[in-house]
Amino acid sequence: MSGQQSSPVYKIALGIEYDGSKYYGWQRQNEVRSVQEKLEKALSQVANEPINVFCAGRTDAGVHGTGQVVHFETTALRKDVAWTLGVNANLPGDIAVRWVKAVADDFHARFSATARRYRYIIYNHRLRPAVLAKGVTHYYKPLDAERMHRAAQCLIGENDFTSFRAVQCQSRTPWRNVMHISVTRHGPYVVVDIKANAFVHHMVRNIVGSLLEVGAHNQPESWIAELLAAKDRTLAAATAKAEGLYLVAVDYPDRFDLPKPPMGPLFLAD
């Protein structure tokens, strides 16, 4: 028996999309619904062995993903169609595998990532929406998207984001490098698009909450820069709701050659 060879282990990466409105966040937790738990259950059924997944970004309760990336290891040799169509057949309708790729041993969905990108969608109309109520955040006061965009540009670069960091954040440092931030209007929709090497807890939603104050002319354009410099969470606005937030893309070194599907969500082009 001692001469038997162990089965080879395969490392697989998946692109995942999900509507987070009915889940208590990404991370598996006891007695509440999580995206991770549903995905691991479906993968384990296809692999016929227990599967544990690692993700690029652990989204909070109510937050959505169109560009989430995960990896897992398995001794099960399956065709790509099993990891896509097969897993999707075992998933609830609000979670889906979008792509599959066999990856090198040194790939890690979280630690190999060089940047994450989020988009926050605001439905800016006097009356609330019904069809996309859980996919957008409703804000009834008229917003000046161009004003919001100008105010946000001070956040680009490496900065201390203490003013936009949740009190319970467990990150060792508040410093993050924002590579891109824009605010654009598409009819009644206002979209905040932000890319950074990583994010402190609630960073995007806290930034959006303060940008809403600028867009509604409750605060001057200079206010965002003042908040950034103050390094005081209590001075900034309330945290924006989870419903409008999407993890839309994760960047990795080119050598991993991962698929790059359209970011979206919905009608939004890249």
Swiss-Prot record:
Cited InterPro entries: PsdUridine_synth_cat_dom_sf, PsdUridine_synth_TruA, PsdUridine_synth_TruA_a/b_dom, PsdUridine_synth_TruA_C, TruA/RsuA/RluB/E/F_N
Enzyme class: isomerase
The keyword tRNA processing appears for this protein: yes
PANTHER family noted in UniProt: PSEUDOURIDYLATE SYNTHASE (PTHR11142), TRNA PSEUDOURIDINE SYNTHASE-LIKE 1 (PTHR11142:SF0)
The protein's assembly and partners: Homodimer.
NCBIfam families: hisT_truA
Protein name: tRNA pseudouridine synthase A
Organism: Salmonella arizonae (strain ATCC BAA-731 / CDC346-86 / RSK2980)
